[in-house]
Amino acid sequence: DRWKTLEAWPAPVSRIEKLYLGETTLNAELAEGERTFVYDPENPVPSHGAESVLTTIAEAGSLLQPEPDYRPDVVSFVSAPLEKALPICGQIKVHLNVSTDVDDTAFTAKLMEVFPDGRAYNIRGGITTIAADLPEGQTYTPGQTAKVCVEMWDMNWTVPRAQRRHRLVEDRGVPRRPRLPAVRRSQQLRRSLV
């Protein structure tokens, strides 16, 4: 680790990289596919490591994460090993096409660095709801496809060569984010752009 000094923050954008979600992978090319999971508010996904100022000091920061798809309500997408180091500077946005069987729900996304031995550490995360991304005055109709964007705080991080990027999508990270008191429901990710 090392500190870097920049003349302005966020740093000026020099290049935008788009990655697409495949069935279980992060790809440079658009891939067809969808993933489905069921969110149970009685068994929320626990948060572990975060950049939020609202967590306990023991749970803050970049921490070792569970294996990809360690729960049926967590879907993971992992890139191929990087051929060269990848600097990430600025904001990360995860664009998803989603569908659910309730009036509103939340989606979280987490970016992780995966080491060659399989260990994964969180880098950044964010959350949004379907309602937050709808034009003002519009409501979501269960079963329709909606576009949502999970925005993450600006950052400056370099993922070393031979490491992989891991994108995780889930409904909640409790206690960092409160659970929604909704009924058990099905979530569907459709051809999602990252």
Which residues does each predicted region cover?
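C-terminal, loop-rich substrate-recognition/catalytic regions characterized by aromatic stacking residues
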Residues: 1-194
